[in-house]
Structures are given as C-alpha cells and as structure tokens.
Regions:
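Active-site loop of short-chain dehydrogenase/reductase
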Residues: 19-20, 70, 99-101, 145-160, ...
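Conserved glycine-rich cofactor-binding loop
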Residues: 28-30
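Conserved glycine-rich Rossmann-like NAD(P)H-binding loop of the short-chain dehydrogenase/reductase
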Residues: 44-58
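The beta1-alpha1 cofactor-binding region of Rossmann-like NAD(H)/NADP(H)-dependent oxidoreductases
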Residues: 54, 77-88, 120
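Catalytic Tyr-X3-Lys loop
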Residues: 109, 116-135, 155, 172, ...
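Short beta-loop-alpha junction of Rossmann-like oxidoreductase domains
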Residues: 113, 203-211
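Amphipathic alpha-helical dimer-interface segment in Rossmann-like NAD(P)H-dependent oxidoreductases
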Residues: 129-149, 187-192
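Catalytic loop of short-chain dehydrogenase/reductase
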Residues: 146, 150-191, 203-204
C-alpha cells in the first residue's frame, strides 16, 4: 500500500507564505475593475476574470498595466454558473502565474424580482452565481494553497442591502445573505491557511440596472 503524504499544517496565518497574485472575478467593469486596478497599483499580479465581456476585460488589463507596468495582468474567461469551470479557472490562474494567493469574488448576478414574482429559475440562477460559485472557487483555492504550502485570502463582496433590508431584488438579496453566512463558516473551517472575509459596499459605481 502506498503511503499518503500528510497534509501540511499551520499553527497560524503566515503572511510571508501568501503570494502577491490575485484573481478578481467580474473584473471587466465597475467595482471589479476598480479592485483589479487598485491591486495592480499596489504591486499585485492580477488575473482578470470575465464571462462574456472580453473587450472590457482587456480594457481592465490595459489600465492595470498602465498603473504598474511590472505586474503583467492576464485575462481569463469562465462561466461561473458551471462548477467545473470554477475549478478550471483557479487551475488556469495558478498555472499561468505559478501561484495564487488571493481571490476577490466580485462577479454577481443582479436581476430584479420581488417576493411575488420570484420563481425557481431566478432563485437558482442567483444562488449559483452569487453563492455557489464563490464557495467553489474558495474550495479550489484552498486545495491550491495546500499543494503549494502557502497562505491566502478571500474577499467576498456582499451588499449593504443585507443590513438595510427592503423587499426588492428578492433572489439577489437571499443569495447574498447566504454568501454572508458562508463567509463566516468558511473562515472558521479554512483558518489559518486561508482567511475569508466579506465586505458590503453601498452605492459605489454606476450599475446598468440602475442607470
């Protein structure tokens, strides 16, 4: 019988083991683009994810390179509605950069419904995009860090609506509420190797839904 190598363990988070490479999902536009640009300006190598807006993602990459020519940002396409695509995205970024230390789950589905109009299709779509995809990406990143014996961080974008509740965007709000709970549980389960936190921005950049 072949012996299985033990999983490397850590007694505490070690920032020196955290590669300065970050994947930002939904980084082609709005808040995701701003986050990617800030990371690049701060010296992080940035992987720019997009689903269908390749031109916007390339624009973000160009902006990052202008802010810091040394970071050499790359773009990656993936449909996060597919769990296998989530795994493949983490693997592709890790292979392209050699390592991955941070994940910013910025991509989100934000479609209007309410308590009377919501249905199974709307709930399922929001759940997959806003809850399951961030969880799956976090799981894959954790295993990547185990393989590299590194440390990392995940930032989940939540929404101020969770603390200023109103009945519109019903499916979206429920999916973000689930992500907020998942953030706490993942942080407890994956520490100290992987830090998982959430931030809940208010109105920051123009949304096509609200313009």
């Amino acid at each position: 019988m072949t012996a299985t190598a033990p999983t490397p363990t850590l007694s505490a988070f070690d920032a020196t083991r955290m590669p300065r490479t970050a994947l930002v999902t939904g980084a082609g536009t709005r808040l995701g683009k701003a986050i990617a640009c800030h990371l690049a300006q701060s010296g992080w190598r940035v992987a720019i994810h997009y689903r269908s807006s390749a031109e916007a993602a390339e624009s973000t990459a160009a902006a990052c390179a202008t802010l810091n020519p040394s970071v050499q940002p790359l773009t990656f396409q993936a449909d996060l509605a597919d769990s296998n695509a989530c795994d493949a995205l983490i693997d592709a970024v890790g292979q392209a950069f050699g390592q991955l230390g941070a994940l910013v789950n910025s991509a989100a589905l934000f479609e209007h419904d309410d308590a009377l109009s919501t249905d199974q299709a709307s709930m399922a779509a929001h759940w997959q995009a806003n809850t399951l995809a961030p969880i799956r990406l976090t799981q894959r990143l954790y295993h990547h860090l185990i393989d590299k014996d590194g440390c990392g961080a995940v930032v989940n974008l939540l929404d101020q609506k969770l603390w200023n509740m109103n009945p519109d965007f019903f499916s979206y709000t429920l999916s973000k509420s689930a992500l907020e709970t998942a953030t706490t549980m993942l942080a407890q389960a994956l520490a100290p190797r992987l830090r998982v936190v959430g931030v809940a921005p208010g109105l920051t950049l123009t949304s096509h839904m609200l313009s």
